[in-house]
């Protein structure tokens, strides 16, 4: 789905399909869609991976170049180990600090992170199963904005009152955010399981001494 198709979907849900008398412009709906895409990205970001060089003797990495970064899930260093050697890390602004493992020696590391989803004229990175969810959030924002504008005006046209639009929009946003919270919890559990630090069981046959 591209942006034009998403706008059409949102218009359909809003019953705003009379091209001679649109209640919302394409620009307005695009703004609401982008807001919904941003919120989806916070709960369920686009999985991404980057290869960055470390600096010998330093545990700090500049991650400002990670495009549209929403979060960092894991840091693998050194790369190529089996199982993967994930390290503990901390982030302050655009600076990531590797907190565990051997001192970096200038070799590469892998950064697994979540990025903002893309929805533009060319296409989308949003999974098909979440397109209706994004449309629902955009509808909620559009309805609330229109209701806030029209609620104190008399002749706004249409058969639905501004108050009804406000209630409908608030319910759409409530359902949208509730589903985002559910998806966010599930995604955190998945990330925790996928990128857990490798801690092999202690040997029962080797004596490590007192």
Annotate each predicted stretch with a short phrase.
Residues 1-210:
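Glycine-enriched, solvent-exposed interface loops adjoining structured elements
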């Amino acid at each position: 789905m591209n942006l034009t198709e998403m706008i059409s979907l949102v218009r359909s849900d809003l019953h705003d399909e009379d091209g001679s008398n649109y209640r919302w412009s394409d620009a307005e709906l695009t703004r609401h869609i982008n807001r919904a895409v941003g919120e989806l990205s916070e709960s369920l970001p686009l999985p991404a991976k980057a290869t960055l060089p470390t600096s010998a003797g330093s545990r700090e990495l500049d991650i400002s170049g990670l495009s549209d970064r929403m979060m960092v899930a894991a840091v693998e260093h050194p790369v190529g180990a089996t199982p993967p050697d994930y390290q503990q890390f901390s982030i302050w602004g655009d600076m990531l600090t590797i907190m565990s493992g051997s001192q970096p020696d200038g070799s590469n590391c892998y950064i697994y992170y979540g990025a903002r989803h893309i929805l533009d004229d060319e296409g989308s990175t949003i999974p098909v199963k979440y397109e209706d969810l994004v449309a629902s959030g955009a509808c909620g924002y559009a309805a609330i904005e229109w209701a806030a504008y029209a609620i104190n005006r008399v002749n706004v046209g249409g058969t639905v009152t501004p108050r009804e639009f406000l209630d409908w929009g608030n319910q759409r946003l409530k359902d949208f955010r509730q589903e985002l919270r559910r998806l966010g919890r599930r995604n955190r559990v998945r990330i925790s399981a996928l990128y857990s630090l490798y801690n092999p069981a202690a040997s029962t046959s080797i004596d490590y001494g007192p």
